Amino acid sequence: MADLLLQLSRVAHERNGRRLLDGVGLSLRAGEAAALVGANGAGKTTLLRAAAGLLHAATGEITATGLDPRTAPPAAAARRRLYAEQHPSCAWDQTVAELGALADRPAAWADWAERFALTALAERPLASLSGGERQTAHLARLFASLEEPYGALLLLDEPTAALDRARRETVHAAVHAWAQAGAAVLVATHDAAWARTFPRVVALEEGRLIADGPPAAAFTAELVRAVWGAPAT
């Protein structure tokens, strides 16, 4: 059986008296890719942040790449557990090339910069980029830092929300290729068409897990109304 790379059991989190996660449980093994869907405020970002170890107050069992990310030193899984925020913070005067250098893998960065059509933007400060270009630069830096797909856990929060079609397709291909190479990938997305391409769909509603299975089973009429408010295509 493939390695268990993410295990959540009875995970809960509150903020200002509001329950953001309510007893969520799920697991991901090497080679699995799952789409995480839900309406705004359903708890998708909170779940990804908990799995990434950024919510130290979250309760329940959280194991990511064999460690509890709430207590493990950040360096312990720096290149095996990768988290992409939807709106990453950045130094606005930093150039695209300087951001890429943080991956500390020049050849890999050059490859991803080319794939994402960032090469011509290398000397541009992040502040001068469009939202989509900035998101792409952060994704390229993150992807370049992945040394070995097998055994890695990728947690991606709306990675294609601001991207153009060509860059979206690059992300789509990379995500599925990594899963095939043995990574575990959990992707929060509002893109119903992309979510349907995943072998597994996990759905949240008001912090609770309401569906977990293949798209044909998870995409019920109730889920589609709750998340998209209309038939999802």
PLM features: residue spans?
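The feature captures the beta-strand-to-loop junction immediately N-terminal to the Walker
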Residues: 37-39
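Conserved structural motif at the start of ABC-family nucleotide-binding domains
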Residues: 6, 21-23
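H-loop (His-switch) and adjacent beta-strand-loop-beta switch element
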Residues: 198-214
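Conserved ABC ATPase "signature" region
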Residues: 107-122
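Conserved ABC transporter NBD signature motif
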Residues: 60-68
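ABC ATPase NBD coupling module
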Residues: 68-82
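Helix-to-loop junction immediately C-terminal to a conserved catalytic motif
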Residues: 52
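Catalytic Walker B motif of ABC-type/P-loop ATPase nucleotide-binding domains
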Residues: 152-158
